[in-house]
C-alpha cells in the first residue's frame, strides 16, 4: 500500500487560480455562446423574446442566485407542466433552460483552464513543435497491427456510465482546489438531476444531460475515464515481470486538454476500504504482454496470456468499478474471445487477425524438404452494415441500402448540395482508405452519389437519369476527389513523466479530431 500511496500522491506545489469568480465575467459566456450554443436545441426559442444572438450578464448572475434558492427548479417545472403552451410560462421555461445551459457551457470552459495551462506550459518547456503532434489517422492501426499480431485473446470493454454525481465531483477535487467552484458544480448537478426527474424518466436523464450539456458532459466523462485508466496503469505496473521497464498506453484526449499524471491522496481511502481485494490479486497474475487501447466509451484489451489470465483482468475491471466507483457492473458484459477467430468493431473498422500459411522448399545438398510456415496478418474491413445503418438514420438511404433523396437539403443551392455530399464521400473515403477490402467502400460511395442525384432531381421536379446525364463527369469528379484537409490526430512521441518513487513511465496521448461525421451536417 505504500507504493500505491506514492503512486496516488499529488504534487501540491502547483498553485491553481481561483476559477469561481470567473463565473461572473461576461466574456466567459460570450465564449460559451459563440462556441457551444449556436447549434443547440434551446438556442432558437430565445428568438421569441428578442435575444437572438445576444445575452445579458445580469440575467446570468440572477439565474446563479436563483439556482441556490430552494424552490427555483420546482417552480420552473410546475410552470412548464401546467402551462407549457401559454406564452408567459413557456417563455419562462425556455429562458431558464437556455441560461442554465449557458452556465453549464461556461463552467465547462472554466474547469478546462488549469489543464490547458499545464499542457501549453509543457510543450513550451519541451520546445515541441505543433507540427510534430499531427499524424495521419492510420498511424493508429500500424500500432495495433504490431501489438495484436503477437496476442492470443482480446476483450471488448464498454466503459460503464453513469456513475454517481458525487463521485464525479470527488474526482475533480484531485485536480481543482477551488472549493466554491466545486460546491457550485455539486449543487448544479444535484438540482439538474432533480429537475429532470420531473420531466423525463431516470433512465433517460444522463442521455438528456449529455445532449444539452455536451461540453460539460465530455469533461466529466473524460475525467472519470482518466481516473480508471491511471489505476489501470498502476495495476499493469504491478503485474509486469520487469517492474521498472517502460510501456505504452493510449489515453484519449477529446474535448479535454490533458490527462493528469498524478492522483489525489484522498482517493487512497477508497483503496484502503477494499485493500483485501487488491492485495489478494495484484501478485496473482503476471502478464508482460497486455495491451489496452480505448476510443471514446469502448476499449479493447489484448493479451498473449491464457484464457484464465484474461478472466483475471476481467474481474479486476469489474471490482475496480464496483468497489472504487461504487458502480454495479455485470461481469458478463465483458466478452473474452480468441483473436484468431474473432472480429471486433473498433474506431469504425472491423478488425481481425488472419493466419496465412505458406510452404517453402528447402534444399540442403542432396536432400530437400518442405517447410510449412504460418504468419499472422492484421486485417481491417469497412463495416458496410454499420455505415448503411448510419446513413439510414440520417435519411440518405433505406435500411436495406437503397438510396433516397434528402428533402431537408432541397432549399440549398445545387452547388451546396453537391459539395455536402462530396465532402461526406471524401471524408468516408479517406478514413476507410486503410481497409484491405474496399468493395464495401465503393458501395457507400454509390449510395451517396445516387442520393445526391435523387435530391437534386426532387428539387427541380425532374428524373434522376436527367441529372446524371446533365452533370455526368462533374458529379463523379466531385465525389472522387481527394480531401484537401485530411483527418488527423494528435499523436505526440512518448511523453516521459515521473511518478513518485518510480522511474519514468511513458504515456501516449491520442486525440481524434474527427471521425467521418457523416450525419452531422444538418
From Swiss-Prot:
Domain of life: Eukaryota
Entry annotated with the keyword tRNA processing: yes
Main location: plastid
Keywords associated with the record: Chloroplast, mRNA processing, Plastid, RNA-binding, tRNA processing
InterPro entries assigned: Domain_X, Maturase_MatK, Maturase_MatK_N
Keyword flag tRNA processing: yes
Molecular function via GO: RNA binding
Transmembrane domains' residue ranges: none
Localization annotation: Plastid, Chloroplast
A GO BP annotation: tRNA processing
Entry's Gene Ontology cellular component terms: chloroplast
HAMAP family from the UniProt entry: MatK
Free-text function comment from the UniProt entry: Usually encoded in the trnK tRNA gene intron. Probably assists in splicing its own and other chloroplast group II introns.
Similarity field: Belongs to the intron maturase 2 family. MatK subfamily.
Name of the protein in question: Maturase K
Source species of the chain: Iris domestica (Leopard lily)
Amino acid at each position: 500500500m505504500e507504493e500505491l500511496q506514492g503512486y496516488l500522491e499529488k504534487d501540491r506545489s502547483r498553485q491553481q487560480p481561483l476559477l469561481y469568480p470567473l463565473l461572473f465575467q461576461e466574456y466567459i459566456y460570450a465564449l460559451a455562446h459563440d462556441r457551444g450554443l449556436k447549434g443547440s436545441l434551446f438556442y432558437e426559442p430565445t428568438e421569441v423574446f428578442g435575444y437572438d444572438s445576444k445575452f445579458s450578464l445580469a440575467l446570468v448572475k440572477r439565474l446563479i442566485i436563483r439556482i441556490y434558492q430552494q424552490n427555483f427548479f420546482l417552480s420552473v417545472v410546475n410552470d412548464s407542466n401546467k402551462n407549457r403552451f401559454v406564452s408567459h410560462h413557456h417563455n419562462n421555461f425556455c429562458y431558464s433552460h437556455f441560461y442554465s445551459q449557458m452556465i453549464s457551457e461556461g463552467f465547462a470552459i472554466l474547469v478546462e483552464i488549469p489543464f490547458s495551462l499545464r499542457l501549453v506550459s509543457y510543450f513550451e518547456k519541451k520546445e515541441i513543435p505543433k507540427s510534430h503532434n499531427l499524424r495521419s489517422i492510420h498511424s493508429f492501426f500500424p500500432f495495433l497491427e504490431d501489438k495484436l499480431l503477437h496476442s492470443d485473446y482480446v476483450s471488448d470493454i464498454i466503459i460503464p456510465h453513469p456513475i454517481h454525481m458525487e463521485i464525479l465531483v470527488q474526482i475533480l477535487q484531485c485536480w481543482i482546489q477551488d472549493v466554491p467552484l466545486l460546491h457550485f458544480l455539486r449543487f448544479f448537478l444535484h438540482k439538474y438531476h432533480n429537475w429532470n426527474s420531473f420531466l423525463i424518466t431516470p433512465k433517460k436523464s444522463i442521455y438528456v444531460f449529455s445532449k444539452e450539456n455536451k461540453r460539460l458532459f465530455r469533461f466529466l466523462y473524460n475525467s472519470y475515464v482518466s481516473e480508471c485508466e491511471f489505476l489501470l496503469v498502476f495495476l499493469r505496473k504491478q503485474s509486469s515481470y520487469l517492474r521498472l521497464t517502460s510501456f505504452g498506453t493510449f489515453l484519449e484526449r477529446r474535448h479535454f486538454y490533458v490527462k493528469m499524471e498524478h492522483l489525489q491522496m484522498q482517493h487512497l481511502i477508497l483503496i484502503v476500504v477494499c485493500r483485501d481485494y487488491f492485495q489478494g490479486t495484484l501478485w496473482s497474475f503476471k502478464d508482460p504482454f497486455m495491451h489496452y487501447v480505448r476510443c471514446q466509451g469502448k476499449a479493447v484489451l489484448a493479451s498473449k496470456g491464457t484464457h484464465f489470465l484474461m478472466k483475471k483482468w476481467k474481474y479486476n475491471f469489474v471490482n475496480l468499478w464496483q468497489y472504487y466507483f461504487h458502480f454495479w457492473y455485470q461481469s458478463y458484459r465483458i466478452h473474452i474471445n480468441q483473436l484468431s477467430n474473432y472480429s471486433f468493431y473498433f474506431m469504425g473498422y472491423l478488425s481481425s487477425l488472419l493466419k496465412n500459411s505458406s510452404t517453402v522448399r528447402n534444399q540442403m545438398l542432396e536432400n530437400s524438404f518442405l517447410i510449412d510456415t504460418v504468419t499472422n496478418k492484421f486485417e481491417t474491413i469497412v463495416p458496410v452494415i454499420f455505415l448503411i445503418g448510419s446513413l439510414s438514420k440520417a435519411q440518405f438511404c433505406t435500411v436495406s441500402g437503397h438510396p433516397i433523396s434528402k428533402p431537408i437539403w432541397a432549399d440549398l443551392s445545387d452547388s451546396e448540395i453537391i459539395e455536402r455530399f462530396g465532402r461526406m464521400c471524401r471524408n468516408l473515403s479517406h478514413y476507410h482508405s486503410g481497409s484491405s477490402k474496399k468493395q464495401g467502400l465503393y458501395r457507400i460511395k454509390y449510395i451517396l452519389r445516387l442520393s445526391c442525384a435523387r435530391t437534386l432531381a426532387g428539387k427541380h421536379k425532374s428524373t434522376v437519369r436527367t441529372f446524371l446525364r446533365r452533370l455526368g463527369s462533374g458529379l463523379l469528379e466531385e465525389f472522387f476527389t481527394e480531401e484537401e484537409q485530411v483527418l488527423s490526430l494528435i499523436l505526440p512521441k512518448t511523453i516521459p513523466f515521473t511518478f513518485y518513487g518510480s522511474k519514468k513511465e511513458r504515456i501516449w496521448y491520442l486525440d481524434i479530431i474527427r471521425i467521418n461525421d457523416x450525419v452531422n451536417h444538418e
